[in-house]
Amino acid sequence: METSETIAVLGAGGLMGFAMTRNMARAGLDVRAWNRTRAKAEALADDGVHVADTPADAVRGAGIVVTMLADSGAVTSAFEQALPGLDATTDPHPIWLQMSTIGEAATRLCESIANSRGVGFVDAPVLGTREPAERGELVILESGPEEARPRLQPVFDAIGRRVIRAGEAGAGTLLKIVVNSWVLSVVEAGAETIALAEGLGIDPDLFFKAVEGSSLDLPYLRTKGSAMAARDFKPSFRLSLAAKDATLVAESALVHGLDLPLFDTIAERLLDGALEHGDEDFSATYLTSTPDRAALSGLAEIAGPRRPCPSAAARQPALRKRALRQAVSQPAASLRRAATAAGTRR
């Protein structure tokens, strides 16, 4: 499907944003782009993308504004900076296509900001990492006004292989949180399985052979598990972002009164791993399960009676509090500024 509308992408220099922007341009769309570190987006000019110096310049004349940034603070900050260049008096009004993974509360805030400025809002996070993004094979979790879909379809066609309609704005983010809980759980379980195999002197390849062809043989686990065994952590999706996403899952569970003790532990592991390996692929969570074997030599023989593990119920409050602090500490100031700005514009 063709469109004459200009597309502006805020966050065009990241692993995902760069690939998505390039695919839009290669699909024949008129694309303008901005990235906080301009150098990371400059190569897009080779595909005809206008790389702007500011968000306001990037959105000038655009009918659709895409945000693909690391967290809620970056999203709200970029969109606030873009507002002076956005003309909401046009018919039809501009649409803010928010594709970052930012959580429930931040998504509601973004919708409020858009509504206060006469801008349409569609919440459409994506499933997929760098490689599917480069191939234009992302899965898009669309939510928002259905009448916006025809205008957005050319963008979806350029970057994705499938669009799932989730419902009203915000439902896409909720679905993404649910999917992330599964993906992060699978990778963390795989990391501990590979670490256990190696610790017991078992070749991880034997594990994969044991489950090969069965319902336990998950292609994604095989991909990430092979990377762990090979110590290949070239980032497709950074561990720091996986930890951020884990805090969003923990936050939603807490808000909705759910008891997820297993995921609380997974979130802790990802947060711990991100402290040292945040810029590596999130399969590097495996490294948190591989202590110095020399230091542990003979430990089994000299260890005393095993202490009982604290119950999940006992661990839950502390784990969730830490996860939530991590989730909101950085973007909090930006969210407050955005909320104040939205209130004064009504």
List PLM regions with ranges.
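NAD(P)+-binding Rossmann beta1-loop-alpha1 motif at the extreme N-terminus of oxidoreductases
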Residues: 1-67, 94-95, 130
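Hydrophobic beta-strand scaffold residues
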Residues: 31, 51, 120-122, 163, ...
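Rossmann-fold NAD(P) dinucleotide-binding segment
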Residues: 55-119
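Rossmann-fold dinucleotide-binding core
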Residues: 78, 101-181, 311, 329
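Helical "substrate-binding/catalytic lid" subdomain
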Residues: 171-285, 289-292
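NAD(P)-dependent dehydrogenase/reductase Rossmann-like domain
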Residues: 275-346
